[in-house]
């Protein structure tokens, strides 16, 4: 193994000199043994640049506390490698693939894979576009996810992002028999801890791998943790041939960490202070999230929009890769309608009659038309009251209120809060139910019967109980 010495340390960036002809390759992991508070620790860094004079510039993936000039550095000869396979299920890892859940070390024979690899070739990519059924009515009908596609999840604090993510993990585990990988990129440690505890309570932890690079960690760790999680997901896809769900929360922090690393490496900043390699870094991550002939990775990415400016380079770069957007609205959550997905703001690339079929397309568009008209009439209703509306508009408003309530759904992972058993609604049942409502077949049923149910059959049953 090549040995080198630290020449300079600035924050989490270090320059390391090696002997001529024994230089480590770009992206190789290098290790430094040192003592911190009397304990032996190994600090890992990643080679980023060859700066001449037999010297490399590396970015540390851990705190550089305790490091000093002259310390010996070992080139591992390979990039950062993380454990993969079924032995990782139910565990929490850091960027280096070390278990951080205090449940003991992984077996010695666990397979490891490097986090840097090429995206699938054109021959390996599966070109067919299929709907990814989530069992959540509002998503499947109005902004369907794509198998092997990428969805952006927009939402503020407390509108239900985490619960929606948990329900998707639960549904894919039970209905599709697949695994989920969660990448916490620049996450609050408390949120990661809450998610782990909630997953244990709801019973989905055994089908999930969690990978965290927290807010308090150096930018190198936050930049690479998404790749660590993606590598685990790729192995599940390629080895088990199943549909994998990859959650990234938050993709903005990935770009933010890249910006910090870029500045530390001395690159000239680009627009709004972001790194000049922003598009390349985002593309390198996103292009690996895809369907191949062996299986698919479907990704749901939470996206923070700085100052609500959608033209900011970080979210704007992410948008170009998204196939669907799910917008969570505080106004809808205040009405007690969960999931609080905005039916008019959420979009999907496959909302096309040639892909989803004419019946699905026309039903979804009519639902949106009715809800949009109801939104337009809100001011008139608030000022003049319902009596001033035309007969057609009165019928439309009544129908819209039923649709709005019917877009709510009890979740399996929220059973302990709501007291209602969770519902998974198949796509054909969703289309049939909404088609019946927009055609006026259920105008006579009370509004309350449409709230927090699965398919239309449950509405009819609830209406009987309300009347009885």
Swiss-Prot record:
GO CC annotation terms, alphabetical: plasma membrane; proton-transporting ATP synthase complex
Keyword NAD: no
Alphabetical UniProt keywords: ATP synthesis, ATP-binding, Cell inner membrane, Cell membrane, CF(1), Hydrogen ion transport, Ion transport, Membrane, Nucleotide-binding, Translocase, Transport
Gene3D superfamilies: 2.40.10.170, Bovine Mitochondrial F1-atpase, Atp Synthase Beta Chain, Chain D, domain 3, P-loop containing nucleotide triphosphate hydrolases
Signal peptide positions on this chain: none
Coiled-coil residue spans: none
Assigned EC number: 7.1.2.2
Subcellular location: Cell inner membrane
Superkingdom to which the source organism belongs: Bacteria
Example of a GO MF term: proton-transporting ATP synthase activity, rotational mechanism
Membrane topology field: Peripheral membrane protein
Subunit field text: F-type ATPases have 2 components, CF(1) - the catalytic core - and CF(0) - the membrane proton channel. CF(1) has five subunits: alpha(3), beta(3), gamma(1), delta(1), epsilon(1). CF(0) has three main subunits: a(1), b(2) and c(9-12). The alpha and beta chains form an alternating ring which encloses part of the gamma chain. CF(1) is attached to CF(0) by a central stalk formed by the gamma and epsilon chains, while a peripheral stalk is formed by the delta and b chains.
Record-given protein name: ATP synthase subunit beta
Source organism phylogeny: Bacteria, Pseudomonadati, Spirochaetota, Spirochaetia, Leptospirales
Gene that produces this protein: atpD
């Amino acid at each position: 193994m090549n040995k080198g010495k630290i020449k300079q340390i600035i924050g989490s960036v270090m320059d390391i000199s090696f002997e001529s002809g024994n230089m480590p390759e770009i992206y190789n992991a290098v290790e430094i043994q040192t003592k911190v508070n009397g304990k032996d620790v190994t600090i890992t860094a990643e080679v980023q640049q060859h700066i001449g004079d037999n010297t490399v510039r590396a970015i540390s993936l851990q705190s550089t506390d305790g490091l000093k000039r002259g310390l010996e550095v070992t080139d591992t000869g390979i990039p950062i490698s993380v454990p993969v396979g079924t032995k990782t299920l139910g565990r929490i890892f850091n960027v280096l693939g070390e278990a951080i859940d205090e449940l003991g070390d992984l077996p010695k024979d666990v397979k490891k894979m490097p986090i840097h690899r090429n995206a699938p070739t054109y021959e390996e990519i599966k070109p067919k576009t299929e709907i990814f059924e989530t069992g959540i009515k509002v998503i499947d009908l109005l902004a369907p996810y794509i198998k092997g596609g990428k969805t952006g999840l927009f939402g503020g604090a407390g509108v239900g992002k985490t619960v929606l993510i948990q329900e998707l993990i639960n549904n894919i585990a039970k209905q599709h028999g697949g695994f989920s990988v969660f990448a916490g990129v620049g996450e609050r440690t408390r949120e990661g801890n809450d998610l782990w505890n909630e997953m244990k309570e709801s019973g989905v932890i055994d089908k999930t791998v969690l990978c965290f690079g927290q807010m308090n960690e150096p930018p190198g760790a936050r930049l690479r943790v998404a790749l660590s999680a993606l590598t685990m997901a790729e192995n599940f896809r390629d080895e088990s041939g199943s549909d994998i769900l990859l959650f990234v929360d938050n993709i903005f922090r990935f770009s933010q960490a890249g910006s910090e690393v870029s500045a530390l490496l001395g690159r000239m900043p680009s627009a709004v202070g972001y790194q000049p390699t922003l598009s390349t870094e985002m593309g390198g991550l996103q292009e690996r999230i895809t369907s191949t002939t062996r299986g698919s990775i479907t990704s749901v990415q939470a996206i923070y929009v700085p100052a609500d400016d959608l033209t900011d380079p970080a979210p704007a770069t992410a948008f170009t890769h998204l196939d669907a957007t799910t917008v969570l609205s505080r106004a809808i959550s205040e009405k007690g309608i969960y999931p609080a997905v905005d039916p008019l703001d959420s979009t999907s690339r496959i909302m096309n009659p040639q892909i989803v079929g004419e019946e699905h397309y026309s039903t979804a568009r009519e639902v949106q038309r009715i809800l949009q008209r109801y939104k337009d009439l809100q001011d008139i209703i608030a000022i003049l009251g319902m009596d001033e509306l035309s007969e057609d508009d009165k019928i439309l408003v009544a129908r819209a209120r039923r649709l709005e309530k019917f877009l709510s759904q009890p979740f399996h992972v929220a059973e302990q809060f709501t007291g209602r058993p969770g519902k998974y609604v198949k796509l054909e049942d969703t289309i049939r139910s909404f088609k019946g409502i927009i055609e006026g077949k259920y105008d006579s049923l009370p509004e309350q019967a449409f709230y927090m149910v699965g398919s239309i059959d449950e509405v009819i049953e609830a209406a009987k109980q309300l009347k009885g």
